[in-house]
């Protein structure tokens, strides 16, 4: 969640855009279009990069070696593409900042903040990509006593979908 601080930069009254992608958790290790972005260099500050404090450009394929699944990495690449190609954010002012277990919400398995460097505030969170697992739907199922299972027609299995959430301050 984006919290209000830094005076006018972050106010309580602003628009937050969210996109939630529901998917079969058994398919998170793959994405049908991953090959189209596998050589894309992503500007990341992984947990292990923090001591150096330097953004490292890694290809999407290289990021799979850090344990991140292709489905998640694909969406990181598409977010970065949007910020570079549509919004024209300068490359050197952009990074994905990986949150560690004590920084991220307990229900997020993977969590990267999208940060943009602002002249007066340094790198500042502007959005994020959160893998929320099945936390939301299992909670709703428990409270409502309604099954949240769906049939994945491609595999024939019943699953509770997992959620990948993209959120951005507008």
State what each model feature region is:
Residues 1-170:
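TRNA-recognition modules of translation machinery and tRNA-sensing kinases, especially anticodon-binding
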